[in-house]
Amino acid sequence: MVRVWNYSKASPQTTILPALVRYPNFEARTQCEVLKINLDKSGKRATGVTYVDTSGNEWEQPADLVLLCAFQLFNVQLLLLSGIGKPYDPNTGEGVIGRNYSYQVTSSVDAFFDNKVFNPFIASGSIGMCIDEFNGDNFDHGPHGFVGGGYLGAVQTNGRPIQSTRTPKGTPRWGLGWKQAVAKNYLTSYQVVTHGGCCSYRDAYCDLDPTYTDRFGRKLMRITFDFHENELKMSQYLTDRLAEVAQKMGPRQFEKKPRTAPTTLRFTRRHIPAAARSWAPIPRAAR
């Protein structure tokens, strides 16, 4: 187990909570989940929260001040479930809660070598180098027909034997041929990446799912989103520049993987630029 004592990892469990637990008037109730924000009779002021513990018991915690400090999507879900603010309506453009959802635009180039060993298992989240010349307004967008941009990066974060295994195009999906390709390319392949911004659009938003519920019977969060022409053009341009870098590395083979649409994503990432307009007209005590 590695303990980080220099507070370089800016997460609540490593920076905020260790400082708060020293105070006698602070209590951390772990493994509990807030179900809703409670409001007064006027519906204009938060009075506390209702939460459930590991035994399934519901508790009400009164409060003069309620802070929404969960992950962004859970904050939006709590606002919608609690009846706080006006839900966004994509048909009229009215409402703020769930509005302005945007994502990230990533792409990659897989490069396969014969004479280079990368040892992907020697990695961390901060090992890498980036080219920032194609980010934001760092270059002339005029001839390209899109706004925005992103970085070109060589970032080695992990060497997981399944999820991070790369095989060249034409490799069988299973069997002896696949095993041979994995054995040949695991140490000698590398993926360079792009990571770009994404605009907010009227047809991209979060709302409550009309069909599916969680284990408490609450409506799940639903995300309606796809990439637009601007992001697709940007991804193609960045990926082409990235391929030029990869080609200079001298691989025997490389494959470009720009972002395409339509797409269906299983949400796994934590990079969400927006999911609710700031600030929404919510009760003062719930901010």
Task: State what each model feature region is.
Residues 1, 161, 166-172, 176, ...:
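Patatin-like phospholipase A catalytic core
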Residues 1-34, 264-269:
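Conserved redox-cofactor binding core of oxidoreductases
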Residues 17, 76-80, 239, 243-246:
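Non-transmembrane alpha-helical segments in soluble domains
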Residues 22-23, 32, 36-42, 49-123:
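Glycine-rich loop(s) and the adjacent beta-strand/alpha-helix scaffold that form part
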Residues 35-40, 187-198, 222-225, 229-287:
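A glycine-rich dinucleotide-binding beta-alpha-beta segment and adjacent secondary-structure elements
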Residues 44-50, 188-191:
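Short, hydrophobic/aromatic-rich segments at coil-to-beta transitions
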Residues 94-221, 229, 267-275, 281-285:
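FAD cofactor-binding and catalytic pocket of flavoenzymes
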